């Protein structure tokens, strides 16, 4: 959620930055007008309340003096009615302001490239060289079916499209991957957490999914619960409405959880394979940091995600998202895209973002600065470390052999009882 004070005092700059995210300046101008109307009305209400208090004191004094108070009581009743009406008007203006502030995206950091969509993202660096096969590379969904480790047909029968069963060595591979990821993040100082897989609406508001992106989620009817779209939601809301000791920062959390997404608007995209599912596992990283340290922490978090890909020896590139392609809550985002041979392209496998104080303001997560004792909003960061299903896809395709088998990356073999190859039966 944006800071109204910043919009008031730095309107032109904020409007210019939000315009790069598709926000019409007229929308901000309307918001500014409503805010001024509210502040002017608030002054009037306070003046009337002060006047009412004065009249109330005069009535009390008149009663002590046994004087007639009818006129003063009538005046106070009139003032009370005016205050009540103005309070109702204030409530309406507050609702309008809330609608604005909760649906406007975050202000992009100065270092974010300006652009309309993913075509204007900027490549930062590459690691590894895409493997050139001397045979025709298979897609991971064909490899998974041929090896009898992934079953989409029965996933569709049991549930529907974009669901699958991992079975046998496929299930073991997935488990090996996320255990490896969690162990690596643990070495970097992250505290491992097992979160609830359902959260309430306040939590969804805190991280920015609600109210704007309700259509992307699975709500449990007749309850206040939502299936989590990412562990970012419960991890970030862990400290909702709390004040932390500044000496404890930064705090690092990591969690593996299922993620549930309706994929609204994705009809026809990635209809086969592990890239876009309604339910998938993901290892998440979340940080709570002081504002002056948050961008250094973003670089570290991105490096933590890169470390996983490097140890798996999967070629990838890092991309800085442009203003038009960033997520709603992000002030700056790096995407990690892994090489997918059958598609002859890089595909997103991680997204690491600094939301600055955007989520902290919504969730009221603050810290007491040990330097001056003041309570301040902290910065929150989140990143995938990594999307597990997409990592399975990348391993199957990059480690495939001409005979249809798949070599297990060396770092995963201890998690699979020393197994080196998944071979056709």
From Swiss-Prot:
Enzyme Commission number(s): 6.1.1.11
Protein's cellular compartments: Cytoplasm
Reaction(s) catalysed (UniProt annotation): tRNA(Ser) + L-serine + ATP = L-seryl-tRNA(Ser) + AMP + diphosphate + H(+); tRNA(Sec) + L-serine + ATP = L-seryl-tRNA(Sec) + AMP + diphosphate + H(+)
Residue stretches in coiled coil: none
Positions bound to ATP: 261-263, 348-351
UniProt entry keywords in alphabetical sequence: Aminoacyl-tRNA synthetase, ATP-binding, Cytoplasm, Ligase, Nucleotide-binding, Protein biosynthesis
Major subcellular site: cytoplasm
InterPro entries in the record: aa-tRNA-synt_IIb, aa-tRNA-synth_II, aa-tRNA-synth_II/BPL/LPL, Ser-tRNA-ligase_type_1, Ser-tRNA-synth_1_N, SerRS_1_N_sf, SerRS_core, tRNA-bd_arm
Any one GO molecular-function label of the UniProt entry: serine-tRNA ligase activity
Record comment regarding domains: Consists of two distinct domains, a catalytic core and a N-terminal extension that is involved in tRNA binding.
Subunit structure: Homodimer. The tRNA molecule binds across the dimer.
Protein name as it appears in the record: Serine--tRNA ligase
Native source species: Streptococcus sanguinis (strain SK36)
């Amino acid at each position: 959620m944006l800071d109204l004070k910043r919009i008031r005092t730095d309107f032109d700059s904020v409007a210019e930055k939000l315009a790069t995210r598709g926000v019409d300046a007229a929308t901000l101008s309307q918001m500014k007008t409503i805010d001024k109307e509210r502040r002017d009305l608030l002054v009037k209400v306070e003046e009337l309340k002060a006047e009412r208090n004065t009249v109330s004191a005069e009535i009390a004094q008149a009663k002590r003096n046994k004087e007639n108070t009818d006129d003063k009581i009538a005046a106070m009743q009139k003032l009370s009615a005016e205050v009540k009406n103005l309070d109702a008007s204030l409530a309406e203006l507050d609702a309008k302001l809330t609608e604005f502030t909760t649906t406007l995206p975050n202000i992009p950091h100065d270092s974010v490239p300006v652009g309309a969509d993913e075509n204007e993202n900027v490549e930062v660096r590459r690691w590894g060289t895409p493997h050139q096969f001397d045979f025709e590379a298979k897609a991971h969904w064909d490899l998974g079916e041929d090896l009898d480790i992934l079953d989409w047909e029965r996933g569709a029968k049991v549930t529907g499209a974009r669901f699958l069963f991992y079975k046998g060595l496929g299930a073991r591979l997935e488990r090996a991957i996320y255990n490896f990821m969690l162990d690596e993040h643990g070495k970097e100082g992250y505290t491992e957490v097992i979160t609830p897989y359902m959260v309430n609406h306040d939590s969804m508001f805190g991280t920015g999914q609600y109210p704007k992106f309700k259509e992307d989620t699975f709500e449990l009817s007749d309850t206040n619960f939502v299936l989590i779209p990412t562990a970012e939601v419960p991890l970030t809301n862990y400290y909702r409405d709390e004040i932390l000791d500044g000496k404890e920062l930064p705090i690092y959390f990591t969690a593996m959880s299922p993620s549930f997404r309706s994929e609204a608007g994705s009809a026809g995209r990635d209809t086969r394979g592990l890239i876009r599912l309604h339910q998938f596992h993901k290892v998440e990283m979340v940080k709570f940091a002081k504002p002056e340290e948050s961008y250094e922490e973003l670089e570290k978090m991105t490096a933590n995600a890169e470390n996983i890909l490097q140890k798996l020896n999967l070629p990838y590139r890092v991309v800085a998202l442009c203003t038009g392609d960033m997520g709603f809550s992000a002030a700056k985002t790096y995407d990690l895209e892994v090489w997918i041979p059958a598609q002859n392209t890089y595909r997103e496998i991680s997204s690491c973002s600094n939301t600055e104080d955007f989520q902290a303001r919504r969730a009221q997560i603050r810290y007491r600065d040990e330097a001056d004792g003041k309570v301040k909003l902290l910065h929150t960061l989140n990143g995938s470390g990594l999307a597990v299903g997409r990592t399975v896809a990348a391993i199957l395709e990059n480690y495939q052999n001409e005979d249809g088998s798949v070599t297990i990356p060396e770092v995963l073999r201890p998690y699979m009882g020393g197994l080196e190859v998944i071979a056709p039966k």
